[in-house]
């Protein structure tokens, strides 16, 4: 067990179930929510070590969730899960305070390295999202900071 508490926010039950099994082997307590309001409430209540949140949670203004989480809970590390692999989404999430960006289609391979990197104060972007030159430049910028 690496840490005590992780909070997973995703409105897709299959994703929650698959990721939960993985997280239970890495954390003492795994909490799950399915929307932005529940995420913010749970983060306030349980103060997790890590939040893994779907970029497209219901009632979310997408990027705003990363910014809101970072502004409200700057000490909680954040990894964004997303189906979007465009450099603008990645850049906006990372600039908003996320430390990791994992594509849902590669999460089975990328989530553990992302968690390990982020918990050790490094950043992580799914390698499959880095095939575009502008995404590679973004990764280099975030790795240097």
Q: Across the structure, where does each feature detected by a protein language model lie?
A:
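Two-component/phosphorelay signaling modules centered on CheY-like receiver
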Residues: 13-31
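Residue-level signal for the "D+5" position in two-component response regulator receiver
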Residues: 32, 57-60
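Short hydrophobic/Thr-rich beta-strand motif most characteristic of the beta2 strand and flanking loop
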Residues: 7, 27-37, 42
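Conserved active-site segment of CheY-like receiver
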Residues: 11, 81-85, 104-106
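Short, flexible helix-to-coil linker/hinge segments that flank and couple to helix-turn-helix
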Residues: 89-95, 99-145
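Acidic catalytic/metal-coordinating carboxylates
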Residues: 35, 61-64
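Active-site residues of response regulator receiver
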Residues: 54-55, 82
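Short amphipathic alpha-helix used as the core "switch/output" element in two-component signaling
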Residues: 63-75
């Amino acid at each position: 067990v690496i840490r005590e508490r992780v909070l997973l926010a995703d409105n897709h039950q299959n994703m929650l179930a698959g990721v939960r099994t993985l997280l239970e082997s890495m954390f003492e307590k795994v909490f799950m929510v399915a929307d932005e309001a529940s995420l913010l409430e749970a983060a306030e209540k349980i103060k997790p070590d890590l939040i893994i949140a779907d970029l497209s949670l219901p009632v979310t203004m997408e990027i705003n969730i990363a910014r809101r989480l970072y502004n409200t809970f700057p000490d909680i590390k954040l990894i964004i899960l997303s189906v979007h692999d465009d450099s603008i989404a990645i850049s906006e999430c990372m600039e908003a305070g996320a430390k990791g960006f994992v594509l849902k289609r590669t999460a089975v391979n990328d989530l553990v390295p992302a968690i390990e990197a982020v918990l050790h104060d490094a950043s992580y972007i799914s390698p499959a999202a880095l095939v575009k030159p502008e995404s590679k430049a973004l990764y280099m910028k975030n790795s240097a900071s």
